[in-house]
Amino acid sequence: MPPLSSEQGGKETLNNSTELFRYCTSVGVYEGYSKKEKAHIVTARMPDDVVNAGGQRFIRHYLDEYQFMVWLVCHATIISEDDMYEAASDLWYECDIQPKKPIIRSYRELREKKLLAMSQAEEKEVSLYEIGTQIQPYTISLSSSIFAQRSFRVLKNALWNTIKGNFLPKEEKKIFKFFSGNKGYTFFDYAKKEDIMENESYLAVGKSIKNLLQKGYMCPVGWCFMPSD
């Protein structure tokens, strides 16, 4: 796995179609998985002292699978460092990636790269969480915009998806129904409604969303949606 590194500026094509939902927090935005780099890409928000010294406000970082899992759990909500470390430790025991990296090393790496949650957002700064919830809503794959852009094959697939939706697992059907009736909503809207951050079911919900993305039932706005033949 590649070591943690960063890149300032620039863009590259990311395959988001089968990856976990775009994940936004007050300190970073999950951009997706790069097959070329074999790494998860996070755009991180740098603190004021870095910007005042001439650095950029946003810098892209590359995380391997284990570092990404730690980052994902640590940023499900803004929590204390003690809780953060405990969550990361629990993940270490569940991790099936070999060889396992020492937990303290990964924790320190993320902290040094400014990827750990801040105790509170800096004053007069718009958080990436707020930006992300505005620019990255989910849309159901059978939306009117999809109909307008695609051919009969898309219509056929979209209608078939609706029929198959009745046979989705309970949790996936619940999520699908929520986004069908709430255009423009994000994962965080669903998380707030179901209070999943408190009952620690966000990873299970994330897996269900990933399944829906893979099956083509829904896709985030701005992502390319191509129904399967």
Residue ranges with predicted function:
Residues G10-T13, I41-Q56, A148-N157:
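Charged, low-complexity, helix/coiled-coil-prone segments
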Residues P2-V27, K36, Y202-D229:
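Long, low-complexity, charge-rich intrinsically disordered regions
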